[in-house]
């Protein structure tokens, strides 16, 4: 993947054509004028609200006049259809890099209802520019992948109808001191529009409730945070705590109503027991009755 600003300074070819001078403002570029897409590949989330997506076009130099360009669709390399799956915002495929500036954006919008989950949609764009401004090393095209992203609504995700309904879950997990993977029922309740409290994740005998926080700010990277908190008592160590692991983020999926917690179990000032994965599927009350696979009576606390 091309990152223009980094490559401009890092690649041997760029170094040959670039003459840099040191000033109070830092390093400045004084080579030829090139204009291109800032990257070769973008992923565009398509949501059920009026969101636009920007594809930056960058120039290596500024100019004292406006620079106008057109952007065209490369049909033979595109699977998405303009007017059906996406459009240019304001129906305009023209951009202007204003005088004194280096960047302008191609603005796109997706049509959520016309895109299916299984669709593999790509838009290939070509920048129409003077030949002298095209940098052969990077070309004048880019690709935009369209990905449908369902909205995150807590009640729908948890499959509850009322705010105070019990949350029913199927949990697939293994626990410390036991290498086998098992499936259990688990339960909880909604605290607010982004927080779920798990009441029996570590077994009914555990009095500790586990708080997890959903973050949907980036629709392409739906994350869960589990703050540091006591999880259960262990006979030799006392309270064992759990927390999210930065290197292995916990996440959730709005298509299939499931979430995955990757947690470190540890005792403060003593050390870690390891990192464990817990997979949860949200089910409604009817599915819970049909499933009837018993409460999660086994957990860390079962080995105390």
What are these regions (language model features)?
Residues 9-10, 86:
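Short hydrophobic/aromatic segments of transmembrane alpha-helices and their interfaces
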Residues 149-304:
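Ser/Thr/Gly/Pro-rich, low-complexity flexible regions
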Residues 11-15:
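Alpha-helical transmembrane segments
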Residues 17-20:
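C-terminal motif of bacterial Sec signal peptides marking the signal peptidase cleavage site
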Residues 1-9:
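Bacterial N-terminal signal peptides that target proteins for export
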Residues 22-105, 109-170, 303-304:
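Acidic/polar, low-complexity intrinsically disordered N-terminal segments immediately downstream
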């Amino acid at each position: 993947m091309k990152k223009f600003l980094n490559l401009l300074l890092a690649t041997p070819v760029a170094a040959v054509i670039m003459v840099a001078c040191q000033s109070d403002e830092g390093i400045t570029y004084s080579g030829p004028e090139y204009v291109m897409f800032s990257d070769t590949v973008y992923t565009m989330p398509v949501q059920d609200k009026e969101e636009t997506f920007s594809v930056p076009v960058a120039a290596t130099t500024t100019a004292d006049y406006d620079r106008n360009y057109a952007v065209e669709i490369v049909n033979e390399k595109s699977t998405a259809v303009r007017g059906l799956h996406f459009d240019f915002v304001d129906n305009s495929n023209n951009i202007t890099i204003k005088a004194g500036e280096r960047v302008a954006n191609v603005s796109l919008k997706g049509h959520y209802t016309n895109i299916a989950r299984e669709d593999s949609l790509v838009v290939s764009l070509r920048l129409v520019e003077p030949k002298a401004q095209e940098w052969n090393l990077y070309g004048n095209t880019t690709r935009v992948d369209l990905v449908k992203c369902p909205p995150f609504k807590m009640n729908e995700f948890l499959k509850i109808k009322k705010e105070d309904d019990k949350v029913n879950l199927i949990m697939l997990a293994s626990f410390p001191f036991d290498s086998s993977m098992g499936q259990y029922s688990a339960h909880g309740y909604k605290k607010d529009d982004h927080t779920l409290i798990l009441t029996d994740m570590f077994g009914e005998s555990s009095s500790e409730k586990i708080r997890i926080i959903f973050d949907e700010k980036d629709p392409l990277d739906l994350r869960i945070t589990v703050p540091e908190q006591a999880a259960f008592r262990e006979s030799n160590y006392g309270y064992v705590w759990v927390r999210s692991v930065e290197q292995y983020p916990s996440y959730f999926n709005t298509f299939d109503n499931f979430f995955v917690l990757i947690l470190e179990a540890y005792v403060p000032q003593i050390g870690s027991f390891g990192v464990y994965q817990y997979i949860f599927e949200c089910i409604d009350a009817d599915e819970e009755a049909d499933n009837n696979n018993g409460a999660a009576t086994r957990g860390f606390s079962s080995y105390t």
